[in-house]
A protein has these predicted regions:
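Cyclophilin-like peptidyl-prolyl cis-trans isomerases
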Residues: 1-190
C-alpha cells in the first residue's frame, strides 16, 4: 500500500492505527464482487461465524479529504475510508478504522454518462468526471459513483491479484465471506 500525502488526516490516522496493531486480526467483513472489499471493524477480531459486522469503530471520525483535482479517485486498487450514509452523516466524515479497497468494473462512455448524472444529482453538480478519470474507468475500472462521496487516501501497489481473489470469495446474504478472510498483521514499510 502507498498512502497519499495529499490526504494527511487519513494518512496519519491509518498509520497510527497500523502502528498500534489495531488492524491485526481484523476480517474483510464485507465483500462485494466487482465492487470492493471492506475491512477494519474492530469487532471482527473475535466475531463468531456468520455474525453481522460493520458497526464497530473508534469514537471519532475523520473529516473528508476529497482530492479529485489531484488525480485521487476510485480507480481499481484505491484505498478509501468507509463511512456512515448521508442520512446520518451529511458531512461525509470517514470512519476512524473501517476502509475498503476498490475493485469495481470497467465502464464505457454510456455507463460513465449515467454515473455523471447520478453524481450531478447527489453532489449538486460539484463532482465532474475529468477526461483522465473517464479514461481510467474505461481501461482500469473502478467505482466512479463514489467520487466526491468517500475519501480515497491510498492505493494498492502490489498484490492486486490478492484483492481480486478476495473479491471473488463466496459470501452470505450480508456480504460477509463464508470463510473468514483475515488481516494477520499490518505493518509500516518505509
Amino acid at each position: 500500500m502507498e498512502l497519499y500525502n495529499e490526504t494527511p488526516l487519513h494518512r496519519d490516522n491509518f498509520l497510527s492505527l497500523v502502528r498500534e496493531g489495531a488492524y491485526d486480526g481484523v476480517l474483510f467483513h464485507r465483500v462485494i464482487q466487482d465492487f470492493m472489499i471492506q475491512g477494519g471493524d474492530p469487532d471482527s477480531v473475535s466475531a463468531s461465524p456468520g455474525q453481522m459486522l460493520g458497526e464497530g469503530d473508534r469514537d471519532y471520525k475523520v473529516p473528508p479529504e476529497f482530492r479529485l483535482e489531484e488525480g485521487i479517485y476510485h480507480r481499481r486498487g484505491s484505498l478509501a475510508a468507509a463511512r456512515e450514509g448521508d442520512d446520518v452523516n451529511p458531512g461525509k466524515e470517514s470512519s476512524a478504522m473501517q476502509f475498503y479497497i476498490v475493485w469495481g468494473r470497467v465502464f464505457d462512455d454510456e455507463g460513465l454518462d449515467r454515473v455523471q448524472k447520478r453524481l450531478d444529482m447527489s453532489t449538486g453538480g460539484t463532482v465532474v468526471l475529468s477526461g483522465e478519470q473517464r479514461h481510467s474507468y474505461k481501461t482500469e475500472g473502478g467505482t466512479p459513483h463514489l467520487d466526491g462521496q468517500y475519501t480515497v487516501f491510498g492505493k494498492v501497489t502490489g498484490g492486486l491479484d490478492v484483492v481480486d481473489s478476495i473479491q471473488r470469495v463466496p459470501t452470505d446474504a450480508n456480504d460477509r465471506p463464508l470463510e473468514d478472510v483475515r488481516i494477520i498483521k499490518a505493518y509500516v514499510v518505509k
